[in-house]
UniProtKB/Swiss-Prot annotation:
Residues reported to bind Zn(2+): C19, C22, C37, C40
Gene Ontology biological-process entries: cytoplasmic translation
Keyword Membrane: no
The species this protein was found in: Pyrobaculum aerophilum (strain ATCC 51768 / DSM 7523 / JCM 9630 / CIP 104966 / NBRC 100827 / IM2)
Protein name per the record: Small ribosomal subunit protein uS14
Quaternary structure annotation from Swiss-Prot or TrEMBL: Part of the 30S ribosomal subunit.
Pfam families referenced in this protein's UniProt entry, alphabetically: Ribosomal_S14
Cofactor binding remark: Binds 1 zinc ion per subunit.
Taxon lineage: Archaea, Thermoproteota, Thermoprotei, Thermoproteales, Thermoproteaceae
Family recorded in the similarity comment: Belongs to the universal ribosomal protein uS14 family. Zinc-binding uS14 subfamily.
PANTHER family: 40S RIBOSOMAL PROTEIN S29
Name of the encoding gene: rps14
One GO MF term attached to the UniProt entry: structural constituent of ribosome
């Protein structure tokens, strides 16, 4: 098997934004400065005061 290079670090863009809790780069919610992925957001939403997720 050929060896593969790690992905190039980007100085800006979607690949730079990470979830503060788990570190994933997929589905990050940036609104209100949350910077959480949707999965982490669902877990901590009640503590943050989002009533829809009680």
């Amino acid at each position: 098997m050929p060896s593969t290079k790690p992905p190039k670090e980007r100085p800006y863009g979607k690949s730079k934004i990470r979830c503060l809790r788990c570190g994933t780069r997929e589905a990050v919610i940036r609104k209100y400065g949350l910077y959480l992925c949707r999965r982490c957001f669902r877990e901590v939403a009640p503590q943050l005061g989002f009533k829809k997720y009680y």
